[in-house]
């Protein structure tokens, strides 16, 4: 740490900006940062590449903002303040939002299936009544419109992959909220660098290094999210049974996301109780 501080004092750290970007990208590959959770979310909603980019950037923005808030708040509140003391609370808050999101995803899928079954029942009843009044072949023109259940996203995908979402789609605000939540866990390394720069009265340098680090992190998170979105599109084109699997995928995805939320909540609670 002493050698790095010397480099900062001499102003040579500008040379390490590309290195900070690379370190941020590599840091994003480490366990955590909600990569699995974000990929599961994108797959569950059959998200587009645009939505995947939005999700990754939102996580990066909140990740960077938390670094700044902790660094400045720590200096103002207490000199003994550490990132470790705030992390349990952030984990607990994130867990509540994540579990709520998982519950919403599960409920949304279940409601879509229930509405579809009710509509099918009403249609079959009307069609049966129509057959008693007229014995012609009118009924044969309607069977192709009602196959096995598809949620809103699957029906839209069958018509046009770029318009797969209807009125019950995941909104941009919901995607942003999920991404912002995923980035709430701070990075102690980035906080340390920023604190050193602030103490050395090199605020601009510290901000630049943190932004560079976050840019590298964004590259990783966006790549993971976009990869999940592209995978959904390609598999749907190549495998005819994808829609059958996809209609159940939201249940598994919501379960996975819920387990991640529970895991974060337990660790956050244990950290607070220490």
Curated annotation (Swiss-Prot):
InterPro entries: Ni/Co_transpt_high_affinity, NiCoT_RcnA
Predominant location category: membrane
Superkingdom, taxonomy of origin: Bacteria
Stretches with biased composition (Basic and acidic residues): 127-137
Transmembrane segments: 13-33, 57-77, 87-107, 175-195, 210-230, 252-272
Swiss-Prot/TrEMBL GO biological process terms: cobalt ion transport; response to cobalt ion; response to nickel cation
GO CC terms in record: plasma membrane
Places the protein is found: Cell inner membrane
Keywords annotated in UniProt: Cell inner membrane, Cell membrane, Cobalt, Cobalt transport, Ion transport, Membrane, Nickel, Nickel transport, Transmembrane, Transmembrane helix, Transport
Location of the region described as Disordered in the Swiss-Prot/TrEMBL record: 127-153
A GO MF term: monoatomic cation efflux transmembrane transporter activity
Annotated Pfam families: NicO (PF03824)
Entry membrane topology: Multi-pass membrane protein
Reported function: Efflux system for nickel and cobalt.
Protein name: Nickel/cobalt efflux system RcnA
Biological source species: Escherichia coli O6:K15:H31 (strain 536 / UPEC)
């Amino acid at each position: 740490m002493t050698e790095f501080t010397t480099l900062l004092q001499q102003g040579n750290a500008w040379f390490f900006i590309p290195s900070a970007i690379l370190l941020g990208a590599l840091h994003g590959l480490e366990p955590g940062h909600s990569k699995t959770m974000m990929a599961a979310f994108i797959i569950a909603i059959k998200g587009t590449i645009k939505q995947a980019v939005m999700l990754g950037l939102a996580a990066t923005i909140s990740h960077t903002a938390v670094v700044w808030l902790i660094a400045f708040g720590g200096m103002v509140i207490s000199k003994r303040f550490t990132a470790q003391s705030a992390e349990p609370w952030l984990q607990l808050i994130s867990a509540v939002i994540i579990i709520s999101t998982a519950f919403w995803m599960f409920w949304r899928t279940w409601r879509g299936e229930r509405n579809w079954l009710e509509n099918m029942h009403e249609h079959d009843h009307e069609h049966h009544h129509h057959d008693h009044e007229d014995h012609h072949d009118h009924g044969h023109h309607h069977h192709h419109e009602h196959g096995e259940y598809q949620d809103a996203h699957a029906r839209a995908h069958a018509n046009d992959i770029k318009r797969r979402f209807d009125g019950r789609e995941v909104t941009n605000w919901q995607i942003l909220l999920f991404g912002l939540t995923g980035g709430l866990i701070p990075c102690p390394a980035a906080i340390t660098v920023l604190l050193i720069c602030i103490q050395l009265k090199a605020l601009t340098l510290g901000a630049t290094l943190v932004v560079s680090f976050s840019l590298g992190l964004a590259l990783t998170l966006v790549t993971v999210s976009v990869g999940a979105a592209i995978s959904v599109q390609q598999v749907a084109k190549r495998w005819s049974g994808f829609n059958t699997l996809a209609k159940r995928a939201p249940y598994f995805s919501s379960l996975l996301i819920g387990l991640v939320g529970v895991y974060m909540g337990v660790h956050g609670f244990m950290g607070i109780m220490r």
